[in-house]
Amino acid sequence: MSGASARSLGKGSAPPGPVPEGQIRVYSMRFCPFAQRTLMVLKAKGIRHEIININLKNKPEWFFEKNPFGLVPVLENTQGHLITESVITCEYLDEAYPEKKLFPDDPYEKACQKMTFELFSKVPSLVTSFIRAKRKEDHPGIKEELKKEFSKLEEAMANKRTAFFGGNSLSMIDYLIWPWFQRLEALELNECIDHTPKLKLWMATMQEDPVASSHFIDAKTYRDYLSLYLQDSPEACDYGL
C-alpha cells in the first residue's frame, strides 16, 4: 500500500516495484519530522509523488538497500537513483523540479537561508534528548538550552523584519525548521518560546499555510505514538490507523 495514511511496510514485506512514470517515490514514516521536510517540499512544489511508509521499529530487509542506515526520508526516481538525508532530498527536489523554486536564486540570499539553518541546527538533537531523557530532573536543563537556541532565531527574525525567515513569502528555510516547532505543544515545550514574540507570530502564520497545516498531528496522537515508539513497539509507526 502507498499513500500518506497507508500502513507501513515491515520485516518480511515485499519490496515495491519500479517507481511509476511521471512520479518520484518517497520512503517515509507518518510521525517523522525529518521525512515531513521532504513531504512538505513535494507538496509545496506540486510534484507528483508516491509515499511508501516504513516501519522504523520493524524495518524491511530490502529497505537497507535503499539506505544502508535504515533511515527515512529516501527519494527514489524513475531511473532508480536514491537520495537520502532530509536536507539533501529537499535541495535535490528544488533543483530537479525548478518550476517553483523554494530556495532563492540569488547566491547571497540562499547563503543567508543556510546560515539561518545553522542557527537552528542544535534544536532537533535537543528535542530528541528531551524526549529520551529518562529522568525528569534533566528536563529543565534541556529546556534552558532550547530557549537559548530559540533566542538566536528570534534575533534573526528581528533583524530580517519580514513575516518569514527568507522574506515576505514562505521559502525553503521555513519548511526545513517547521516540523520541530509544530511538535512543541505535543511535547509540552511551548514555554521555551514564551520569550520570543516574533517566533510565536511566525508559528501562527505557518499554521495558516495549507502545506504546513496539512501535516498537522494532534497532541494526544503524537504523545501516544511517542509512548509506543520509546517502548520499541512495532505498532508505533501505524498508531491511529
Curated annotation (Swiss-Prot):
PROSITE patterns: GST_CTER, GST_NTER. Belongs to the GST superfamily. Omega family. Glutathione binds at residues 59, 72, 85-86. Its main location: cytoplasm. It catalyses: RX + glutathione = an S-substituted glutathione + a halide anion + H(+); L-dehydroascorbate + 2 glutathione = glutathione disulfide + L-ascorbate; methylarsonate + 2 glutathione + H(+) = methylarsonous acid + glutathione disulfide + H2O. The modification N-acetylserine is found at residue 2. The modification N6-acetyllysine is found at residues 57, 143, 148, 152. Residues 22-101 form the GST N-terminal domain. The lineage of its organism: Eukaryota, Metazoa, Chordata, Craniata, Vertebrata. It comes from the Eukaryota. CDD domains: GST_C_Omega, GST_N_Omega. Homodimer. This is Glutathione S-transferase omega-1. It is found in: Cytoplasm, Cytosol. Keywords: Acetylation, Cytoplasm, Oxidoreductase, Phosphoprotein, Transferase. Exhibits glutathione-dependent thiol transferase and dehydroascorbate reductase activities. Has S-(phenacyl)glutathione reductase activity. Also has glutathione S-transferase activity. Participates in the biotransformation of inorganic arsenic and reduces monomethylarsonic acid (MMA) and dimethylarsonic acid. Its EC number is 2.5.1.18, 1.8.5.1, 1.20.4.2. The keyword Mitochondrion does not apply. It comes from Rattus norvegicus (Rat). GO terms for biological process: cellular response to arsenic-containing substance; glutathione metabolic process; L-ascorbic acid biosynthetic process; L-ascorbic acid metabolic process; regulation of release of sequestered calcium ion into cytosol by sarcoplasmic reticulum; xenobiotic catabolic process. One of its GO terms (molecular function) is methylarsonate reductase activity. The modification Phosphoserine is found at residue 129. InterPro entries: Glutathione-S-Trfase_C-like, Glutathione-S-Trfase_C_sf, Glutathione_S-Trfase_N, GST_C, GST_omega, GST_Omega/HSP26, Omega/Tau-like, Thioredoxin-like_sf. Residues 106-228 form the GST C-terminal domain. The active site is at residue 32.
